[in-house]
Amino acid sequence: MKHSSKIIVFVSFLILTIFIGGCGFINKEDSKEAEIKQNFNKTLSMYPTKNLEDFYDKEGYRDEEFDKDDKGTWIINSKMIVEPKGEEMEARGMVLRINRNTRTAKGNFIIKRITENNKGIPDVKDKKYPVKMEHNKIIPTKQIKDKKLKKEIENFKFFVQYGNFKNLKDYKDGEISYNPNVPSYSAQYQLNNYDNNVKQLRKRYDIPTNQAPKLLLKGTGDLKGSSVGYKHLEFTFVENKKENIYFTDSINFNPSRGN
């Protein structure tokens, strides 16, 4: 009887230890998720910024990487990548460098196609069309004979102009990843097709699937803040060996050297 009591006490203690340890692990995961959300919050609070010229007056995170008189450059990038089954991968998007010192914005509309040769080696073909932004309008700086393409470029909208993350706090049960050695961090959430950002993407792009995407928030650099590293968003609709459909977006603030 005495022996049985000892076993019961030991097992009870073991269960309690596992439970407490489990709670600690869960709390740690929740804490890291909250930290990642906090890190992204300042960036995501800029969505939407309908007028791109507002970036001339937006301050970003500054550290010793910036020269004293450098106001910094915002680099925004949006692109849609589609690889249907049995077809080539095509990425269409734009990158714009918004220089706060010169109050000028230049970039490129980029079309990238990736195919594989008989040996399975990727063949990448890029076409870049230089652009500038004036009065919140995208203007090609070189002649484009293809009228349809020219219209696509002139009508292009960055995700920051229509995306909205005011409900970020409502995203729950994310898949959290953190590597302090790089450092890198990410949080991934399953969305549904009723999500406003998903609706906006479907409105603007021909997305050949009804599958709801996952949202990935991914970054590198110190979680407490750094101008070294990057942050980007990814809406992944389909991802496998035969088919890939996803949208990526980023807003980063960097020193203006070379921009």
Swiss-Prot record:
Keywords: Cell membrane, Lipoprotein, Membrane, Palmitate, Signal
N-terminal signal peptide: 1-22
Cell wall biogenesis/degradation is among the record's keywords: no
Keyword Isomerase: no
GO cellular component terms given for this protein: plasma membrane
InterPro entries: Csa (IPR007595), Csa_sf (IPR038641)
Lipidation (N-palmitoyl cysteine): C23
Record's bilayer topology term: Lipid-anchor
Lipid attachment, kind S-diacylglycerol cysteine: C23
Subcellular location, record wording: Cell membrane
Family in the record: Belongs to the staphylococcal tandem lipoprotein family.
UniProt-recorded name of the protein: Uncharacterized lipoprotein SERP2423
